[in-house]
Amino acid sequence: MRVIKGNKCDWEVVIGLEVHAQVISNSKLFSGASAKTYDAPPNTQVSLFDVAMPGMLPVLNEYCIYQAVKTGIALSCKISKYSAFDRKNYFYPDLPAGYQITQFYYPIATEGKVVLEDHNAKEVRIARIHLEQDAGKSIHEFSQTYIDFNRAGVALMEIVSEPDLRSVEEVAEYLKKLRMILRFIGTCDGDMEKGSFRCDANVSVRPFGSNELGVRSEIKNLNSIRYVMQAIEYEANKQVNILENNEIFTQNTLLFDVSLGQTRVIRTKEDAHDYRYFPDPDLFPVKIDDQYIDHVKSLLPELPLQKRDRYINDFNLNKSDADILSSDKDVAMYFEKVVEKHDARLAASWIIGELFGRLNKLGITIDESSVKAEHLIQLLDLIVDNTISGKIAKQVFDMMFESGKLPALIVSEHGLKQVDDADVLYVVVEKILKDNASKVEEYKQGKEKLFGYFVGQVMKETQGKANPEMVNSIIKQQLESK
């Protein structure tokens, strides 16, 4: 969708994103009320400050500063040595003070980037990261509107990109990469369904090749990547149709109607002066020195791209497997536990090829899996020491998911131990070759593919429990002697 074909010209889509990421913190940005509000009954996680009771003053949560600085460092931002809070004035029922405390003039971080590897390592510039309060939640029922103030005052990081994105595919990768980084460093859980990672999209179009930005629309509160893509695609095409018909296009704020797949105007877009920003007189500026920044850097965990490169270089994994295993913090931790005891490629094969398939079928995450890393280690132990074959191991794996039992116990209970007694296997092989005398003759006449058939028959006879290497060796010896 980088270019939309028009009758007059080709149109380029220009997109900038504002992501509102809820800060992982025990308490709110300026009060001691709990920030764990998602499942809480309405208006139970609220302080007097959150509902703007007279005389209540804000007290800055220092941990939110730490989380914002950590985010800025992870996104290659410049951390501001001086940042300050401002009041953004507007009226809405779920904003009891009549203003939102934000950082308009002096944000906490600027000039960062997110690299889109799937789009030729394109760098999407991050203009700024600032801290601000979330608003409450309006709940509409029939003719009544209720206000839940649990969310009011929860800390948000607004991460604002430059208008560098040119397609919905780039948008999707940007959001996934950004969410992955925030999850890895533990500053936001990235759960769009719960509203802790929301996106506003600024969309405009211009004749392809032009350097001037067109009139933009802002689509508010998009809570899934799929909806972000649908909303942008619809809005871009709508703008092209308006401009192609020589109609006047005005700057608006929009909502995306999921059921109709269309955007609709909720208000004419305001400019900054409409909000009458001014410094909050109740809050001191925030001053951050190099020592503090270095301290936060020292606590920063390994980032996803660094982890992926380490998996490729240290474990000799291919890029595809390394990408998958480094894309989620819980998956990476699971993999690294298994790698402490077993070969990395064996571990990767079982996690990606076997574990993920079962997790997807059950619709659960790796953190919710009944088969923990310790259990997979025990299963791989049984394969490596030839207690069971790889084929039997897959059966055991299924039973582990169903019963939650340890692999060694399952093998013992079901008699699944690998047959590695040479005398027993000689008898089985002799029987198979005797029962298939005609095929033995065909094999001797050059039909070498039948070797696999003989192996398969032995495995069938032993219910998959025969040691594959021993079976191959014995069959080869028997055939050569005939």
Curated annotation (Swiss-Prot):
- What is the uppermost EC class here? ligase
Q: What is its EC number?
A: 6.3.5.-
Which reaction is the catalytic activity of this chain?
L-glutamyl-tRNA(Gln) + L-glutamine + ATP + H2O = L-glutaminyl-tRNA(Gln) + L-glutamate + ADP + phosphate + H(+); L-aspartyl-tRNA(Asn) + L-glutamine + ATP + H2O = L-asparaginyl-tRNA(Asn) + L-glutamate + ADP + phosphate + 2 H(+)
Which is an annotated Pfam family here? Answer: GatB_N
Molecular function per GO: asparaginyl-tRNA synthase (glutamine-hydrolyzing) activity; ATP binding; glutaminyl-tRNA synthase (glutamine-hydrolyzing) activity
The record, for PROSITE patterns, names: GATB
Q: Which GO terms describe its biological process?
A: glutaminyl-tRNAGln biosynthesis via transamidation; translation
Task: Name the domain of life.
Answer: Bacteria
Keyword list, A-Z: ATP-binding, Ligase, Nucleotide-binding, Protein biosynthesis
Quaternary structure? Heterotrimer of A, B and C subunits.
**So what family is this one in?**
Belongs to the GatB/GatE family. GatB subfamily.
Query: Matching NCBIfam families, A to Z?
Result: gatB, PRK05477.1-2, PRK05477.1-4, PRK05477.1-5
Main role?
Answer: Allows the formation of correctly charged Asn-tRNA(Asn) or Gln-tRNA(Gln) through the transamidation of misacylated Asp-tRNA(Asn) or Glu-tRNA(Gln) in organisms which lack either or both of asparaginyl-tRNA or glutaminyl-tRNA synthetases. The reaction takes place in the presence of glutamine and ATP through an activated phospho-Asp-tRNA(Asn) or phospho-Glu-tRNA(Gln).
Under which name does UniProt file this protein? Aspartyl/glutamyl-tRNA(Asn/Gln) amidotransferase subunit B
Lineage runs: Bacteria, Pseudomonadati, Pseudomonadota, Alphaproteobacteria, Rickettsiales
